[in-house]
């Protein structure tokens, strides 16, 4: 989504190498960042141009191009849902991340449940992210720096209700990541299994 056309085309070319690598490894998708500059509508236009070209290349290799909510306007699930609809190609979709609806640059918290629902309409992967548990609130998880708190069970129910049947990635971003990452991932996996069993 670079505003400079030459730089945008160079970015498309660089991403083609990742598409090639993904195809070689037998992957179904690569994740890209919806990064750009300008107004919301300007970014939508620039991203549509660059990613459409990447999708046309990746389609020949059977690779999907997925957007993850990951900073800037992309932290808004409604923006990514509109972007995928605008590109309107079968190998372009979304990868909703449960925890990435907070834009640290602008300190904006986008609606996470509504954003997840919007992205799930054309989701091709899901990142089941959790932080640290909230005491006495089952399945609630809270980031240790940002004001992000959410109901992990509700997020999982949104995925179930959407009819999504693809892959889940499990991600943990709690406090003292280096020390606690494995335990955090295993706890998140346990939550998922409990929620599935009770649904």
Could you describe each region identified by the protein language model?
Residues 26, 52-53, 74-199:
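Histidine-acidic metal/acid-base catalytic patches
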């Amino acid at each position: 989504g670079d505003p400079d056309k030459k730089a945008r085309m160079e970015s498309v070319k660089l991403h083609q190498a990742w598409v090639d690598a993904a195809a070689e490894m037998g992957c179904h998708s690569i994740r890209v960042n919806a990064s750009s500059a300008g107004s919301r509508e300007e970014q939508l236009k620039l991203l549509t141009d660059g990613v459409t070209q990447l999708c046309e290349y990746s389609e020949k290799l059977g690779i999907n191009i997925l957007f993850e909510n990951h900073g800037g306007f992309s932290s808004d699930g409604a923006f990514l849902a509109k972007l995928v609809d605008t590109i309107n190609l079968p190998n372009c979709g979304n990868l909703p991340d449960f925890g990435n609806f907070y834009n640290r640059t602008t300190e904006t918290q986008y609606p996470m449940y509504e954003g997840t629902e919007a992205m799930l309409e054309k989701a091709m992967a899901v990142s089941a992210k959790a932080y640290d548990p909230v005491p006495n609130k089952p399945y609630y998880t809270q980031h240790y720096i940002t004001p992000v708190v959410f109901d992990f069970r509700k997020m999982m129910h949104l995925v179930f209700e959407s009819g999504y049947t693809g892959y889940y990635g499990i991600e943990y971003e709690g406090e003292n990541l280096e020390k606690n990452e494995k335990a955090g991932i295993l706890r998140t996996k346990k939550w998922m299994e409990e929620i599935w069993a009770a649904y």
